[in-house]
Design a protein with these regions (language model features):
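Beta-lactamase-like hydrolase cores
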Residues: 24-58, 63-69, 96, 143-149
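Bacterial Sec-dependent N-terminal signal peptides
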Residues: 1-29
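Short glycine-rich, polar/acidic loop-and-turn segments at beta strand-coil junctions
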Residues: 56-58, 75, 86, 120
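Short active-site loop at a secondary-structure junction
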Residues: 64-84, 88
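Short, conserved beta-strand segments within well-ordered enzyme catalytic domains
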Residues: 51-53, 64, 72, 115-117, ...
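Hydrophobic (often cysteine-bearing) scaffold residues that line and stabilize catalytic clefts
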Residues: 28, 32, 73, 77, ...
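Conserved serine DD-peptidase/penicillin-binding transpeptidase domain
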Residues: 34, 38-39, 88-308
């Protein structure tokens, strides 16, 4: 790959610190314990397996219930990993997303490719209130291009999501979780949390479910719809199966005929390419022509070009 010139640091986000609980009074501990004791006698906790252990930063127990029982921690591990990240990275840490280019600039035209180089920021176009809105972020990137003298791109916009090593999901995850919005995984350049929303609706029993992409658009992905409409009362059993190895996704399962039209969220394994696609569209709307289709880079440093 040819040398890439840095343009600017384009997007940053601060990891804010957690406020730690200091020593609680005995009365507060008793109140917390009483609350837990009451709740554990109610459903759904009463018939389930539950363990609670809450302690202060000094190690004093605030509340406890079945604290010695061995349970699968599930998403509680996010508290530990987040706390370790904040402690290790520090309060001044910022994620950075950089712009760069290959080739040369002549008379306002970049004769080469523009790169969006991800730094692991999970918030790009996520819609979170704490983050920069997508249009504001793209406007900032566009200003960086203009400062660099770029008014046209005779080449590709390429999303580079290679900041992290390895696959974007853990190989121990359940197969039917990989296509869900909570099984999307993360890479160095995410977009919209690497989630894609669909509008789905039933038709007739045993007929194919209607399914259309709403956001973000990924016209380079081949979508296969094998989902069917099921009897009333059978619920929503739609699953999408996909991989970052190929731009193919298949919708399977069923949707009850009494469910009506609804929104579904599935994983998007091409976050970097989606980011490049959306930014290229944004540039075109501003009159900054991009002559070639967007692309991304696979884990083996090969540029993958779209045909859409």
């Amino acid at each position: 790959m040819s040398r890439i010139h840095n343009i600017a640091v384009a997007c940053m986000m601060m990891l804010s610190g957690f406020a730690t609980m200091e020593g609680q009074t005995g009365d507060r501990q008793t109140a917390a314990q009483k609350y837990i004791d009451i709740k554990m006698k109610e459903e759904p906790f009463k018939s389930g397996l539950v363990g609670v252990l809450a302690v202060t930063a000094k190690g004093d127990t605030i509340a406890e219930f079945n604290s010695s029982r061995k349970l699968i921690p599930a998403s509680n591990t996010k508290l530990i990993s987040t706390g370790l990240a904040i402690r290790g990275l520090g309060p001044s840490f910022r994620f950075s997303t950089r712009l760069g280019y290959s080739g040369y600039i002549s008379n306002g035209t970049l004769h080469g490719d523009l790169y969006i180089i991800g730094g692991g920021d999970p918030t790009i176009a996520s819609g979170d209130r704490m983050t920069v809105k997508t249009d504001s972020l793209f406007a900032k990137w566009t200003r960086a291009l203009r400062v660099a003298g770029i008014r046209k791109i005779h080449g590709h916009v390429i999303g580079d999501g290679r900041f992290f090593d390895g696959p974007i999901e853990n190989d121990t995850w359940s197969y039917n979780d990989l296509g869900t919005d909570y099984g999307t995984g993360g890479n160095g350049l995410c977009f919209n949390r690497n989630i894609q929303t669909f509008s789905v609706s039933p038709t007739t029993v045993e007929g194919k479910v209607n399914a259309e992409v709403t956001y973000p658009a990924t016209p380079w992905i081949e979508f296969r719809n094998c989902a069917v409409t099921a009897r009333p009362g059978t619920g929503d059993n739609l699953y999408q199966f996909n991989t970052d190895l190929a731009p193919v996704a298949e919708l399977r399962g069923s949707l009850a005929i009494d469910k009506g039209q609804k929104k579904e969220s599935f994983s998007n394994k091409f976050g970097a390419l989606t980011c490049a696609w959306e930014f290229a569209k944004y540039l075109e709307k501003l009159g900054i022509n991009v002559t070639e289709s967007p692309a991304d880079i696979d884990p083996y440093d090969n540029i993958r070009y779209t045909e859409a």
